[in-house]
Amino acid sequence: MKNKKRIVLVVFLLIFTGSLQMIVAQENRGPAAVIINHYATRSFLEGTVPAADLDQIIQAGIRAPSASNRQPWYFTIIQNQDLAKKIVSNNVDGNVLIVVSAEGDGKTNTREIIDCSLAVESIYLAAQALGYGSRIYTGPINALNNNLKKELNLPPGHNAVALVRVGRTAAVDAVSAASNRKKAEETVRYIK
């Protein structure tokens, strides 16, 4: 009889702690947790991003804050894998590249760049909140603006500011998760 009680108690504790872990995990999926725990994915898997998820991710960019509500951004979503690999050579089939562009040269139009940067971060974080890997690229932007603008069919006068890669990922790899941050004491000053 004592063994049955122990077994029942152990089963109860396992169920209770499992439920508690699920509740904690769900609570840790809020916006602050996504921001604090984000990482730039380096290891992507093949697999498409469903249209409904992609729409949510793009809506996050569209809804980003904008100075004077100018909303200067334009989003070009690249699902064509041949074109995507011209921009990001290690792009994996099914990954999506989202090019964020604005009017101007992409270097001196400060207000537009800041607004587009907010849209880029919103897209990046929305993808991670939905369980996808995401990574922001600025390295390919000059080549993209110089060589691929016509192929991307950017609006007249627009230049790419940044792009976000979105795709499936298995888990956090050592390279992606290894980025340490400076301590608050090194980067923050409170003026009271």
Where are these regions (language model features)?
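Acidic, surface-exposed loops and disordered segments
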Residues: 2-192
